[in-house]
């Protein structure tokens, strides 16, 4: 973790920045009387006025006071919420590219309206990033009402949307979405085969809500797009049969803290007996080891109804951090298949990586980045170091009066939950609303059953019921309400005492068939009357709740991060309301088992305390803080390590994606190919003439290799002699120049041939398709090899070598080899692919269609010029090019130029689990895909993923 002194050092000058923000807020407030006098039409016309002034040279900083005043007034007129002074400060902090640290309940979503409106004036697009689809859609509708009133377009990116819908959403002035969706769209844009298929239009300005969750917690898990692997395997079910026969601490050991397993010799022997093999670790059987490890992990580390649920024959991951089911998302590296085998459901295909990027490197693409959170101070150093973001604490609108009670710790979980139920029943009887935070679906359902037995009316908010989330939250602050939530952190919803009037009013209007997006006029016309009616209903109840002590937040377990605990507590005591919080813990809690649990248990045993008598001591708080700090340190190290290794890939990815974009745009295609021909022929000649004199060179082998590359028009026998035993003096340079001239002449003839068959300019289109196809395939193969390299690079430490340095060095060599192979295969395809005119009904400008030439003509050459290999086979050529006249060129694994059957793997909201989402185009056919080793071998042999508006944020 960053040291406290470093954090303090980075926050030097904060006071001056806060004073500056106060002056800006004062200036904006002073403009209110002038703006209030404007009619709706005049207020709306301000947007075009600001755009004209921006085009004439005024900066956004100069427009800020007026633009903020206009957006503030529009918010008041449309949603009955006016930005407080501190929210204006927060908006200015965001515009200047900082993180605004605003406590829970201070109205971060409303604050975001100000910088989003201002920066949308520039016309480059504003991205508002949230933690889940629910919040993205809700905020785009809720705050979109304000932006639409001012003449701006708003849209939302949701999982499952088509490319056309995404393109339209990115064309809007302000686009809402999750970090995963924005990142996946960036990766997909760098997999497309046409400029028309691009969806994003640049990375100008982003506001990240819950910035600590997205940029810190989730940053240790990269975004990965993968597709079905080539090979297949049936071993998952076999090892799912064997796993129950293995006994913990006899056949294997488990480290819960590190979430790893280790197989003992006895376990290996049992597996060998079951499979009828002599040695599990010999080369032929080594792929089975990963199946064994995954089967044991599925048994010990992945629990049904906690980490996943089984619904309609499908294993669906549960984000334990938020309690949401993540439909379509899957674990990587065969883990999901192992769980499917364990649960005896259909086993879906394993995948190979097609594209990947870390969140750190994605968000660093933005020209200006900002964020909002209630808890960023402890991560100030990391945010500054990685993203160059300063953290500015924004004062609260009203003083906090919530009472945070000390933790109560019990010996057993059963005793803890009994005490929780007793506490809740007592508070329910006096009319105090209670919000209970649990860490899993299983625990929330257990508590629900206990409350039902005691006759306590309650609502459950977890992965199985989140469809009713808005209504449950809207009523969670009512007198006597009891709400069990799998986890509230990251939900971005306030629990308002007496009930949330905004959400209740919205639900009422939706029941009448009104909607802020599809029926905006009718919705806005009815809004004020319904809202006033609801406010009157909830006001009296809110007074009763305040008398009862406000919202009581009860946590049933501490989380890995103190920040998450604080977010749960922050649901109570918003905007100066009374409130209370307490955490109930037990020695059986996961955090206590992972760290320091045994020491506490021995103390409680020595004190001879009954199970139902808790202790409340500073020692407990210190132990918990120590455990949480250790987890935070571990996660920080993981994030740093991910970033170090991804920096190597990021440099390579930047080169490939820039090259790919140039090919898409058709920039100087002819010049690129001519240079490739020069490089490839030069490499062949240099390899063949590296040693000795002309009589020592194996020119026959060189010519054989060159003929598989292009139709050679000169005879080496004529160059070196007439065959009578004497050789002419010819230097390597002269030989090279002769062959280069011949190759370029051959390419000119090839271009004339192609243009004659398919029309003028067809050669450029063929070049574009071939280069894209080969580039994509070589990049995928390179990702395979880099992934494999990273898996084993840690062993270099045993040889006293720095694994990172070794990874950088070997990764650079592999990248260079990949680029050489790319040139060679591209030249071979361009010379040897058979081209014919496309059928008129399916013509694609400029009418190029490609079919394979003969196998001999399409054989591939080796990257090592001294020992040439055949060029790509006909099968490989067909994979690279497409097959029929109307088809675009496509690489292996792609269909008509478009990837299909994709899986999208990224971080959960806690950043802890690697998850994936199957693409809509994926076939439902179940197929086992092979191990990573099998896939690599196969690759070499072939050439080798509308909810209610946000609660009212009037502060």
UniProtKB/Swiss-Prot annotation:
It holds the Pfam family SecA_DEAD. It is found in: Cell membrane; Cytoplasm. GO terms for cellular component: cell envelope Sec protein transport complex; cytosol; plasma membrane. This is Protein translocase subunit SecA. It is a peripheral membrane protein. Belongs to the SecA family. Signal peptide: none annotated. ATP binds at residues 87, 105-109, 494. GO terms for biological process: intracellular protein transmembrane transport; protein import; protein targeting; protein transport by the Sec complex. One of its GO terms (molecular function) is ATP binding. It comes from Rhodococcus jostii (strain RHA1). Residues 874-888 have a biased composition (Low complexity). It is an enzyme of class 7 (translocase). The gene is secA. HAMAP family: SecA. Part of the Sec protein translocase complex. Interacts with the SecYEG preprotein conducting channel. Has a central role in coupling the hydrolysis of ATP to the transfer of proteins into and across the cell membrane, serving as an ATP-driven molecular motor driving the stepwise translocation of polypeptide chains across the membrane. Its main location: membrane. Residues 861-955 are annotated as: Disordered. Keywords: ATP-binding, Cell membrane, Cytoplasm, Membrane, Nucleotide-binding, Protein transport, Translocase, Translocation, Transport. InterPro entries: Helicase_ATP-bd, Helicase_C-like, P-loop_NTPase, SecA, SecA_DEAD, SecA_motor_DEAD, SecA_preprotein_X-link_dom, SecA_SF2_C. Its EC number is 7.4.2.8. Residues 943-955 have a biased composition (Basic residues). Monomer and homodimer. Part of the essential Sec protein translocation apparatus which comprises SecA, SecYEG and auxiliary proteins SecDF. Other proteins may also be involved. Transmembrane segments: none annotated. It catalyses: ATP + H2O + cellular proteinSide 1 = ADP + phosphate + cellular proteinSide 2.
């Amino acid at each position: 973790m960053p040291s406290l002194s470093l954090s303090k050092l980075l926050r030097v000058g904060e006071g001056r920045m806060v004073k500056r923000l106060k002056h800006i807020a004062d200036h904006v407030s002073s403009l209110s009387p002038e703006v209030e006098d404007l009619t709706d039409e005049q207020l709306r016309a301000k947007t075009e006025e600001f755009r004209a002034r921006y085009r004439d040279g005024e900066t956004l900083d100069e427009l800020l006071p007026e633009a903020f005043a206009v957006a503030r007034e529009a918010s008041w007129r449309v949603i009955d919420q006016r930005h407080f002074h501190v929210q204006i400060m927060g908006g200015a902090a965001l515009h200047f590219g900082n993180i605004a640290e605003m406590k829970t309940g201070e109205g971060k979503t409303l604050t975001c309206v100000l910088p989003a409106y201002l920066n949308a004036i520039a016309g480059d697009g504003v991205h508002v990033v949230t933690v889940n689809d629910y919040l993205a859609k809700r905020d785009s509708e809720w705050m979109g009402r304000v932006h639409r009133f001012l003449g701006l377009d708003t849209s939302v990116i949701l999982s499952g949307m088509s490319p056309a819908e995404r393109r339209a959403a990115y064309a809007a002035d302000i686009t809402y979405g999750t970090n995963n969706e924005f990142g996946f769209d960036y990766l997909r844009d760098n997999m497309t085969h046409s400029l028309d298929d691009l969806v994003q239009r640049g990375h100008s300005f982003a506001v990240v809500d819950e910035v600590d969750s997205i940029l810190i917690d989730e940053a240790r898990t990269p975004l990965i797009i993968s597709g079905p692997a080539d090979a297949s395997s049936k071993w998952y079910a076999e090892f799912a049969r064997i796993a129950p026969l293995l006994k913990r601490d006899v056949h294997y050991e488990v480290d819960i803290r590190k979430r790893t397993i280790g197989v003992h010799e006895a376990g290996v022997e049992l597996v060998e007996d079951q499979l009828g093999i002599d040695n599990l670790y010999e080369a032929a059987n080594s792929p089975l080891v990963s199946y064994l490890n995954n089967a044991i992990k599925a048994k010990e580390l992945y629990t049904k109804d906690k980490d996943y649920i089984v619904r309609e024959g499908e294993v669906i991951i549960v984000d334990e951090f938020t309690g949401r089911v993540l439909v379509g998302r899957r674990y990587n590296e065969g883990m999901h298949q192992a769980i499917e085998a364990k649960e005896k459901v259909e086993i879906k295909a394993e995948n190979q990586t097609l594209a990947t990027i870390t969140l750190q490197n994605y968000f660093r693409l933005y020209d200006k980045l900002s964020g909002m959170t209630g808890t960023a101070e402890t991560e100030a150093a990391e945010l500054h170091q990685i993203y160059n973001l300063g953290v500015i604490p924004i004062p609260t609108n009203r003083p906090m009066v919530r009472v945070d009670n000390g933790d109560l710790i019990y010996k057993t979980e059963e005793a803890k939950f009994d005490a929780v139920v007793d506490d809740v029943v007592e508070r329910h009887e006096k009319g105090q609303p209670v919000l209970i935070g649990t860490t899993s679906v299983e625990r929330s359902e257990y508590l629900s059953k206990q409350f039902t037995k005691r006759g306590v009316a309650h609502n459950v908010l977890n992965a199985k019921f989140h469809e009713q989330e808005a209504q449950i939250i809207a009523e969670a602050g009512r007198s006597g309400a009891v709400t069990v939530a799998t986890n509230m952190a990251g939900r971005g919803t306030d629990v308002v005492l007496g009930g949330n009037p905004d959400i209740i009013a919205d639900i009422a209007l939706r029941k009448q068939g009104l909607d802020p997006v599809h029926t905006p006029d009718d919705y806005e016309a009815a809004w004020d009357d319904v809202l006033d009616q609801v406010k009157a209903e909830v006001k009296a109840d809110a007074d009763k709740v305040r008398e009862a002590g406000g919202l009581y937040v009860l946590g049933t377990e501490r989380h890995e991060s103190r920040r998450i605990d604080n977010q749960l507590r922050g649901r109570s005591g918003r905007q100066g309301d009374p409130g209370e919080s307490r955490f109930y813990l037990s020695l059986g809690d996961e955090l206590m088992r992972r760290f320091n649990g045994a020491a506490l248990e021995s103390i409680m045993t020595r004190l001879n305390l009954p199970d139902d008598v808790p202790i409340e001591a500073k020692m407990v708080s210190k132990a918990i803080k120590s455990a949480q700090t250790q987890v935070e340190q571990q996660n920080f190290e993981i994030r740093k390590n991910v970033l170090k290794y991804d920096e190597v890939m990021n440099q390579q990815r930047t080169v490939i994606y820039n090259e790919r974009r140039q090919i898409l745009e058709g920039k100087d295609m002819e010049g690129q190919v001519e240079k490739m021909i020069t490089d490839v022929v030069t490499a062949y000649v240099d390899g063949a003439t590296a040693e000795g004199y002309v009589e020592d060179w194996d020119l026959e082998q060189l010519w054989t290799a060159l003929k598989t590359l292009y139709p050679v028009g000169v005879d080496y026998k004529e160059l070196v002699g007439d065959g009578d035993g004497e050789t002419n003096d010819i230097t390597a340079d002269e030989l090279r120049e002769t062959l280069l001239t011949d190759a370029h002449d051959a390419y000119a003839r090839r271009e004339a041939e192609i243009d004659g068959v398919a029309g003028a300019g067809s050669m450029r289109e063929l070049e574009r398709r071939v280069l894209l196809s080969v580039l994509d395939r070589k990049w995928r193969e390179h990702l395979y090899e880099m992934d494999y390299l990273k898996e084993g690079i840690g062993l270099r430490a045993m040889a006293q070598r720095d694994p990172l340095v070794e990874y950088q060095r070997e990764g650079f060599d592999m990248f260079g080899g990949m680029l050489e192979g790319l040139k060679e295969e591209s030249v071979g395809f361009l010379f040897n692919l058979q081209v014919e005119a496309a059928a008129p009904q399916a013509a694609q400008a400029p009418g190029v269609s490609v079919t394979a030439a003969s196998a001999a003509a399409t054989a591939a050459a080796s990257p090592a010029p001294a020992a040439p290999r055949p060029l790509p086979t006909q099968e490989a050529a067909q994979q690279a090019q497409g097959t029929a006249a109307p088809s675009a060129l496509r690489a292996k694994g792609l269909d008509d130029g478009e990837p299909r059957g994709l899986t999208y793997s990224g971080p959960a909201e806690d950043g802890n689990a690697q998850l994936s989402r199957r693409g809509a185009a994926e076939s439902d056919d179940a197929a086992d895909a092979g191990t990573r080793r099998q896939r690599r071998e196969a690759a070499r042999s072939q050439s080798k993923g509308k909810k209610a508006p946000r609660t009212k944020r009037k502060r």
